[in-house]
């Protein structure tokens, strides 16, 4: 068939079937991935037993490395959600930055809160804050809502312990701590881009606000609102941030210490280093965070109530664990069948950098079926066996490329598209795309450019021509949207 090796033919058929099942049938992504893995193995020349062994090995191996972390992460997120810690962060950041900077405060809140809390739930919890501020401070609800959603969405797609990035880290075999720290850095500029776009929306739709007040009335309403929020029974800012900041600090300390002692064998076996390494492991830091959040944020909750909150969090992670494991199964089959190695040999001769493969695959899957988590897991499961065979590829940046690609053009098949637009009362399709499809694409473009630039600096396989893909696609979509909405 077109002179292609059998394993590559198996991969192509598997990808086609996967896309068809997810897009055109009611088959869930988990089952679709298992079917695709089976096809890739059987058509690619593996026996039935070899295929099944590869699937089970890949499934178990992937969940073995990140399953515990996902479970602990969603437990912590559940406690932060029900305790009011997310609201406390929002009110505190708003007070710190002051009036007229609420969009930045909400974006920062989203940036932090979405690390442990699922993005849809976080927006539902925090949107009333944006709505109240718009009503009491003559701020555009579009600006505040989009800024909040943008901060939430970017870190949700790029920073562990959110399940998607965790799964990607496991599939690429990169350190979760490194993924967390790199993801937080990479997420910064896309969030800034969304906030600037959100501020532009105020000029685009100036009549979206409610009543008009004098400056004195605005100040009184704003001060009164902040004061009323401060009287609400919420945990302190320090306690609200502690479960999120603690893992970051411990992981950072471990990374710095390892950097200094990695070439000293005696230091690596010393008791102090072992303690730092133990406390900086993602499983340990998240377990500590869950314990701290339970005893500091839910001090009055009884045993049964606390257990209920934690179990509710775990329920949300079930299907994500299955999809992540299925992605690992598909990746294992591609490695064992030889498809990854053979495709790597073909790609090595193409005029593109390997780092673009997970970015492009994630972008396409996101556009086709809408789920950012499925997009990045699919991209990682397909591309990681390929990139592992190409010398010099920075797998950490490849993992980030897969997560950034999953931000592309959120629209009708993206659940957050409907959450954001429905809660803001936007029913016109063109306006819905302006409000959410465009900012997610801006974040995608900035994120993709950031990864490519980082690869030019820290990798050895990059090219400035890699920038053409995100730049041209982003410019084309923005130009099209501008034409469609020039009369709105």
Swiss-Prot record:
Keywords: Cell inner membrane, Cell membrane, Membrane, Transmembrane, Transmembrane helix, Transport. The chain crosses the membrane at residues 2-22, 27-47, 59-79, 106-126, 176-196, 241-261, 275-295, 314-334, 347-367, 368-388, 438-458, 461-481. It is found in: Cell inner membrane. It comes from the Bacteria. GO terms for cellular component: plasma membrane. It is a multi-pass membrane protein. Belongs to the GntP permease family. This is Uncharacterized permease HI_1015. It comes from Haemophilus influenzae (strain ATCC 51907 / DSM 11121 / KW20 / Rd). The lineage of its organism: Bacteria, Pseudomonadati, Pseudomonadota, Gammaproteobacteria, Pasteurellales.
